[in-house]
Design a protein with these regions (language model features):
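Alpha/propeptide regions of enzymes that mature by internal proteolysis
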Residues: 1-167
């Protein structure tokens, strides 16, 4: 198989990715969204997974599609990034219709980046604002590596980051 023209997930027509990060916190958020709600699925694994709304992705659930997917640093605190994205979606009139109200469906997963040397002594959780900023930044082209959710990612003592590919 040959990769798409950008070799990014956004080679799939209608997909967009946005990143936002905070260099002092050494953490960030990545949002995957589409021009219309998308079908999604998940396999949760690991010793201490952190997720939000992933149970909705089971085929026997009421919600048939999602409005965006969020990946965030910040461990459990990073789950608040999905609230920032959901607020931005709702303001744009996007979401699952419930009696005339829009309820954005935004599953999220986090990674543990609390021990990477960034300033985690903040008083107000920065992740909702980072989520909203990542939503506003969505595009067909986006940074890889130390960007978005990959900003503070590590694998043991090795630097991690955000990756993407297409086929």
């Amino acid at each position: 198989m040959k990769p798409g023209p950008r070799n990014l997930i956004t080679d799939v027509e209608g997909l967009h990715v946005g990143n936002a990060d905070d260099g002092s916190v050494k953490s960030g958020v990545t949002v995957l969204a589409a021009d219309r709600p998308i079908t999604a699925s998940v396999h949760v694994m690991g010793g201490a997974p952190g997720t939000r709304e992933t149970d909705l992705l089971a085929p026997d659930k009421l919600v048939p599609a999602v409005d965006a997917l969020v990946l965030s640093g910040g461990s459990a605190l990073g789950l608040d990034a999905a609230s920032g994205v959901a607020n931005a979606l709702r303001a744009a009139g996007i979401g699952f219709d419930v009696a005339g109200q829009k309820v954005p469906i935004v599953p999220a997963a986090i990674l543990f980046d609390l021990l990477n040397g960034g300033d985690k002594g903040w008083d107000e959780n920065p992740y909702a604002a980072l989520g909203a900023a990542a939503w506003r930044a969505r595009s067909e082209t986006f940074a890889l590596g130390t960007a978005g959710a990959g900003t503070g990612a590590t694998a043991g003592a090795l630097k991690g980051g955000l990756g993407s590919a297409s086929a």
